UniProtKB/Swiss-Prot annotation:
Keywords: Cytoplasm, Elongation factor, Protein biosynthesis
A cellular component term, taken from the record's GO annotations: cytoplasm
Pathway participation: Protein biosynthesis; polypeptide chain elongation
Alphabetized GO MF terms: translation elongation factor activity
GO BP, sorted A to Z: peptide biosynthetic process
UniProt name for this protein: Elongation factor P
Pfam families: EFP (PF01132), EFP_N (PF08207), Elong-fact-P_C (PF09285)
UniProt subcellular location: Cytoplasm
Highest taxon above the source species: Bacteria
Annotated family: Belongs to the elongation factor P family.
HAMAP family referenced in this protein's UniProt entry, alphabetically: EF_P (MF_00141)
Length: 190
């Protein structure tokens, strides 16, 4: 669908210069001289590079609609991650580097959302929060309760995060998969 350059909003996926880009930031600029334009910071969906572009109001760009499908993670085979389409039961194989460091959070049976463009996967979304076990954590030092302090810990999947001093090895915690940060203990209600 064609849209004007001044209609681009954050989160829109557009086709520009032969690639797919997602708009991150948009700033409408009205200079004293000349016509108004939309300053757009974009990220390439294929290789992750960032790019700034000015779009005049009269310019048109192709806005792309991505298909989103739910897949269930089945297993890992070497560097390949095997997923199953929840509707058609077809299997999809993605390379581990396609998912990035968040691949360590994949668990058997976990539902993920894969973004497809012309039947080709271009992005994957894991659940925002997952429960994992702390494999190693330094013991808490006395007197560390006055200020908000954190200590390093290693999760069962090998990811390093910072946790509060009261968290010990063997405890289950909730981790934000986007920011890779500790949120709370897994048995907490909040």
């Amino acid at each position: 669908m064609k849209i004007n350059g001044n209609e681009i909003r954050p989160g829109n996926v557009i086709e520009h210069q032969g690639s797919l880009w997602v708009a991150i930031k948009c700033n409408a600029v009205k200079p004293g001289k000349g016509g108004a334009f939309n300053q757009v910071e974009m990220k390439n969906l294929i290789d992750g590079t960032k790019f700034n572009e000015r779009f005049r109001a009269a310019e048109t760009v192709e806005r792309v609609r991505l298909e989103q499908k739910d897949f269930t993670f089945l297993y890992q085979q070497g560097d390949a991650l095997i997923f199953m389409d929840s509707q058609s039961y077809e299997q999809l194989e993605l390379q581990k580097d396609f998912v990035g460091e968040r691949a360590a959070f994949l668990q058997e049976g976990m539902t993920v959302t894969v973004e497809l463009y012309q039947e080709k996967p271009i992005g994957i979304s894991l659940p925002d929060q997952v429960s994992v076990t702390i494999a190693e954590a330094d013991p808490a030092l006395k007197g560390q309760t006055v200020t908000a302090s954190y200590k390093p810990a290693i999760l069962e999947n090998g990811i390093r995060i910072l946790v509060p001093p009261f968290i010990n090895a063997g405890e289950h915690v909730i981790v934000d998969t986007n920011e890779l940060v500790y949120l709370r203990r897994a048995n907490d209600k909040g």
